[in-house]
Amino acid sequence: MPYKFTFDLSVVPHKFFKELAYMVDSKRIHKRTGRILRRLIDRFKLSELTGMDFAEILQVIEDLVDIQVKNLAYRQRFEMSKNKALFLPHCARKYVDSRCRAEFDPDVPTFRCRRCSPDCQVNQASRIAEELGYDVYIVPGGSCIPKIIKKHNYDGIVGVACGEEIRLAYTYLNEDIAAQAVPLIKNGCSNTVFSIDSLCKILQSQKI
């Protein structure tokens, strides 16, 4: 959890994210366009909804914009990639104790989902990705990802993580890898949350 604060954007109206995505897709916004972001934050009363300081919510939203911009930049190459993997954070499991039946493989390292909870986001995401032909890794941390990518020569990857971890990941991905990212909308050490709908749109995007 690289952020020095916790956040929960699951309370934010879906309309906010739709408007943010539209502004990025139509090239009407850039990460440094703080004035536009400040207006959006004020209009949707995000500080009041989330209980976060304005500076904290601004940092998170700036990271969301940066992720969306990078997704757009790499989208075409990602759609054409053939050997793909999905990396999920283990903290998004419904349970992070013995109630979770996932088996940990230290040689990879990854958790192997045993499908114990139908309403678990990791269960849902991994099932969808595997049906689409992705290799799936439920990782204990980001430091193991470069080794996995190198070993299997993936040319397209999808990562789910908090915005700051995603930003750090771009620093060790080489130019031969087309990456797409889905940011957490609720961070923390457990019970983190991401948008299954956003992930599915990325997973299903490919050139035939």
Per-region residue spans from a language model:
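Redox- and metal-dependent alpha/beta enzyme cores, enriched for Fe-S-associated oxidoreductases
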Residues: 79-132
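A short acidic (Asp/Glu
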Residues: 98-99, 148-150, 167-171
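Ser/Thr/Gly-rich flexible loops in soluble cytosolic domains mediating phosphotransfer, phosphorylation
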Residues: 113-114, 180-208
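Electropositive, gly/pro-rich neighborhoods at or near active sites that engage anionic ligands
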Residues: 1-93
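Proline-aspartate-enriched helix->loop->beta-strand connector
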Residues: 153-154
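A short, gly/pro- and small-residue-rich
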Residues: 106-108, 169-186
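Gly/Ser/Thr-rich loops at beta-strand to alpha-helix junctions
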Residues: 90-94, 118, 142-145, 159-167, ...
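General beta-strand structural signal in soluble alpha/beta enzymes
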Residues: 137-140, 159, 181
